[in-house]
């Protein structure tokens, strides 16, 4: 593993390795020790007591953060007719049909999220090998395969984030930018925690949130006490 740079080491020294911080303390500290030359993203990582290999312990969904993410999401909507008009009216960046399938196959990726009406999934499905590995495939669980394209586009633009448990049982989510007020970051943090608590699989045994941390784009992780949320 490559040795971290001096700025990272200096940031690390300001974290008490033996302490588990409250959500408020962790967010304040993450903001204080951030050394990026840009408005870095603040991210939370949950280590959950689930077995993702089991179908009944999969966790996936999306949540609208009350204070947004600080990032403007570019939305591509696959729809036709009235639904295409609705998507355009809602502020989608791109709206179309098979012409975008061709563009994406040719390497065009100037979007962050895809929304599709169910009748368009036959077309979008052709892009499975391209979109799947990038996590861009629309999915009913995250509200991106829907007839209500207006709601989908509005929520994404308002600060909707998707979450998904990985093979190791971790869930990562962005909760805003370093420039956000700490209180707004904590409110977003609590929103993510609440939705994950509600998503706890009935089959999950033992401690649900095993580890919890806050970090910035290049910064070290700061341990958080789940009880503080």
Swiss-Prot record:
Binds directly to 23S rRNA. The L1 stalk is quite mobile in the ribosome, and is involved in E site tRNA release. Keywords: Repressor, Ribonucleoprotein, Ribosomal protein, RNA-binding, rRNA-binding, Translation regulation, tRNA-binding. This is Large ribosomal subunit protein uL1. Pfam families: Ribosomal_L1. It comes from the Bacteria. One of its GO terms (molecular function) is rRNA binding. GO terms for cellular component: large ribosomal subunit. Belongs to the universal ribosomal protein uL1 family. Coiled coil: none annotated. NCBIfam families: rplA_bact. One of its GO terms (biological process) is translation. It comes from Listeria welshimeri serovar 6b (strain ATCC 35897 / DSM 20650 / CCUG 15529 / CIP 8149 / NCTC 11857 / SLCC 5334 / V8). Part of the 50S ribosomal subunit. PROSITE patterns: RIBOSOMAL_L1.
């Amino acid at each position: 593993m490559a040795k971290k740079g001096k700025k990272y080491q200096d940031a690390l020294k300001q974290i008490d390795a033996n302490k588990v911080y409250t959500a408020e303390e962790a967010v304040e500290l993450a903001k204080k020790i951030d050394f990026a030359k840009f408005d870095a993203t603040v991210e939370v990582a949950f280590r959950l007591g689930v077995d993702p290999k089991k179908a009944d312990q999969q966790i996936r969904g999306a949540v609208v953060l009350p204070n947004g993410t600080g990032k403007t999401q570019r939305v591509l909507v696959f729809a036709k007719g009235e639904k295409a008009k609705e998507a355009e009216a809602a502020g989608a960046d791109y709206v179309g049909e098979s012409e975008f399938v061709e563009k994406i196959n040719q390497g065009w990726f100037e979007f962050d999220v895809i929304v599709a009406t169910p009748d368009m999934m036959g077309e979008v499905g052709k892009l499975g090998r391209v979109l799947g590995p990038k996590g861009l495939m629309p999915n009913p669980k995250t509200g991106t395969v829907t007839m209500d394209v207006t709601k989908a586009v509005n929520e994404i633009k308002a600060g909707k984030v998707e979450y998904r448990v990985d093979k190791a049982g971790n869930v990562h989510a962005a909760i805003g930018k370093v420039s956000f007020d700490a209180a707004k970051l904590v409110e977003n943090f609590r929103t993510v925690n609440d939705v994950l608590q509600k998503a706890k699989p009935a089959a999950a045994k033992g401690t649900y949130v095993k580890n919890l941390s806050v970090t910035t784009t290049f910064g070290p992780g700061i341990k958080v006490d789940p009880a503080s949320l």
